[in-house]
Structures are given as structure tokens and as C-alpha cells.
UniProtKB/Swiss-Prot annotation:
This is Membrane-bound lysozyme inhibitor of C-type lysozyme. The lineage of its organism: Bacteria, Pseudomonadati, Pseudomonadota, Betaproteobacteria, Burkholderiales. Belongs to the MliC family. Type 2 subfamily. The gene is mliC. GO terms for cellular component: cell outer membrane. It comes from Cupriavidus necator (strain ATCC 17699 / DSM 428 / KCTC 22496 / NCIMB 10442 / H16 / Stanier 337) (Ralstonia eutropha). It is a lipid-anchor. It holds the Pfam family MliC.
Length: 125
């Protein structure tokens, strides 16, 4: 009688069930808003012109992206919008535009030709 292969299969099934439960538990713990989960969260610190810095937390899911940062101590939640190039986030009066490792923050209440609120922001490791 061959009980070893059956026992090995039973162990494999138990292991897969455990891994599946762990993955489901991780997805359930991922931050989210109204049922939209963001399994990919990363923080990036930028060094900008004038010695200014900006810390941004990016929340990514397959269909939704958001960025959270603070301006004058107040949190800004910006969501991704259509962009011809790079990633563009808009929240409140601010627009955060990134391309590669560089970003620019604009205050949309200022004139269109006004200097950015933060310019030449470079991601720091």
C-alpha cells in the first residue's frame, strides 16, 4: 500500500490552503478606501530646489493610484489623473506631477505662469 504519496499530496494541499489564507489575510489588511484596496504602498522623500523637501506616500492598486503629502502641515490626498507623460496627481488646490525620479508641485490657485510651489524635486534613496 502506498501511503507516502497520498500523505505528501495531503501536505501539499494543506500548505497551499495555508498560503492562500495568508495571501487573503494580507489583502484584507492592505489600506483602502470604500472597498478599494492598495496592496502596494511606498514612501518617497524628495529633495527640491531651495533646500525644501517633500515626503510622499504612494498608494497603488491595479486600477487606482493616490499620493498623500503634507503642505504647511496639512495633509493632501491627491488621486491620479490623465497624463500625457509621467504620473499626475491632483488634490485640493495642488497638482503633483512626476516623471521618473523627478517631481514638480504646483498650486493651482496661482496664475498659470507662476513658479511651481516646489520645483526640481529629486527622489532620494
Amino acid at each position: 500500500m502506498t501511503t507516502r504519496p497520498i500523505l505528501s499530496c495531503a501536505r501539499a494541499v494543506a500548505l497551499l490552503a495555508t498560503l492562500g489564507a495568508c495571501a487573503a489575510a494580507h489583502a484584507a489588511r492592505a489600506p483602502g478606501i470604500d472597498g478599494v484596496r492598495f496592496p502596494d504602498v511606498r514612501a518617497v522623500r524628495y529633495q527640491c530646489d531651495g533646500g525644501k523637501t517633500l515626503s510622499v506616500r504612494y498608494f497603488n492598486s491595479p486600477d487606482n493610484q493616490a499620493a498623500v503629502f503634507r503642505i504647511d502641515g496639512k495633509p493632501v490626498l491627491a488621486v491620479s489623473t490623465v497624463s500625457a507623460s509621467g504620473a499626475r496627481y491632483a488634490g485640493g488646490r495642488y497638482e503633483w506631477w512626476t516623471k521618473g525620479e523627478e517631481g514638480t508641485l504646483r498650486d493651482l490657485m496661482q496664475a498659470e505662469n507662476a513658479a511651481p510651489a516646489l520645483a526640481n524635486c529629486q527622489a532620494k534613496p
